[in-house]
Structure formats: structure tokens, C-alpha cells
């Protein structure tokens, strides 16, 4: 997988209360990913970007909410979320600080 596709697959971490609990307790991390990304692409992107070993990838499609606007009803975009489980002894560091 080329470097350009790696950055297009992973859109960023998804920060929520549930994601924080999973990261602390089970070493599972949640990312927003491209809607056309496959589990294998997501696994390779995380492994190459963060230098960790991925044990499992679970994905789900999140439906966009319907919202009221001044002109009637509108709909937010659908998006895809990936739960990344790391192998034992691995950890992700989002701060990017070199020690």
C-alpha cells in the first residue's frame, strides 16, 4: 500500500467516552476511516503508521443524522468507524513525542 493511500484510509481518531474506556481497559482504539476502506487496508495502514501489530479490526457504518435547518430537513454524511485491537504488549501513542 502506498503512503498516499495510508493517509486517505485513516481520517483520524474518534474520541468519545466509549472509545476512551476501550483504550484504557482493552487496548482497543477507534478511528474514523474512509467509507471505501477494507479491514485489510485499515490494518496495514495502522501497522505502517504507528509501528504496532494489529490483532483484529472491526468496522461499522454510522448513518448520518437527520437535522432540522432553516430550509427544512438536512442530513449529515454517513461515515465509517473502525475498532482496532492491538496484540498484547503493543500500545498506540497519539502525542507523537519522541523520547
UniProtKB/Swiss-Prot annotation:
One of its GO terms (biological process) is translation. GO terms for cellular component: ribonucleoprotein complex; ribosome. The keyword Metal-binding does not apply. Pfam families: Ribosomal_L23. The keyword Membrane does not apply. Gene3D superfamilies: 3.30.70.330. Keywords: Ribonucleoprotein, Ribosomal protein, RNA-binding, rRNA-binding. SUPFAM superfamilies: Ribosomal proteins S24e, L23 and L15e. One of its GO terms (molecular function) is rRNA binding. Part of the 50S ribosomal subunit. Contacts protein L29, and trigger factor when it is bound to the ribosome. Belongs to the universal ribosomal protein uL23 family. One of the early assembly proteins it binds 23S rRNA. One of the proteins that surrounds the polypeptide exit tunnel on the outside of the ribosome. Forms the main docking site for trigger factor binding to the ribosome. This is Large ribosomal subunit protein uL23. It comes from Stutzerimonas stutzeri (strain A1501).
